Amino acid sequence: MKKQTIITACTFAAMTMATPAVFAVQPAMSNHVCASDAIKKDNRPVESKRLFRSKAVEEQIQRIQQLLKNQKLSWMFTNCFPNTLDTTVHFRKDKKDGKPDTFVYTGDIHAMWLRDSGAQVWPYVQLANEDKELKTMLAGVINRQFKLINVDPFANAFNDGPIPDGHWKTDLTDMNDEVHERKWEIDSLCYPLRLAYHYWKTTGDTSIFDAEWIKAIQNILTTFRDQQRRDGRGSYHFQRVTDRALDTITNDGWGNPVKPVGFRNTSGSSGGLNSSSLAWSA
């Protein structure tokens, strides 16, 4: 890998280290969600049904419970903080190379979003040095993310292995059996870099930066350059039979024409498809 490419990739990773978004909860919702009867109930799965258990996470829950005097906030943290581990994390060793491999469901959909999975496990990175198993699981998420990027850097969500009759198989784009959905969203490539950088800065573990990672970085940079659209319309096209305009792309799936000024075009967003662009250096 060329020195310039490595520097570019590392610089990009550093620039993606933004503070996670904080979502506001409407006052009207808070009383409904945290009714007096609700805070007496443990909504976590029984221990035998939890997908992954971390000693460090359980100890953190106990520490925070001691700090929070508000009973409702304590209940919310106790049930929400471990939810990703309890219900969405599927950890194993890769059958081919024996490395940690973690597939993270995005809630009730049995598929892994690159952006979502990076955000879902983000709060646990701070505890990685306190729990070897947790650290290994996080490395597995990163390993899986970069493998998926190498399957298709334009895809936003992937199946846990090939599924010939996937839910969005009829979308008019370059689908394959491992892809759950192929909406080109620039944050799908930013979040894995952000997670890998933060994990490395926290743990010092460089095992994740292997040949798969180098290939993924090359694919990411190639994709970004392609979507600058300096010459032509780029490689990505997408159409879906739908009654929602946000779920498909105009101009026969190629999107609105843009002036080639160095911006990276991104056809998708977290709320659906559109023709927005993200500023980036030329």
Residues covered by each model-derived region:
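Low-complexity, Ser/Thr/Pro/Gly-enriched N-terminal "stalk/linker" regions
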Residues: 27-115
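N-terminal signal peptide c-region/cleavage motif recognized by signal peptidases
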Residues: 18-19
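Bacterial N-terminal signal peptides that target proteins for export
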Residues: 1-10
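Well-ordered alpha-helical scaffold segments within catalytic/enzyme domains
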Residues: 56-69, 119-132, 191-206
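Long, well-ordered core segments of solenoidal/helical folds
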Residues: 80-95, 137-156, 214-233, 265-268
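Membrane helical hairpin/interfacial module
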Residues: 107-166, 170, 177-181, 203-214, ...
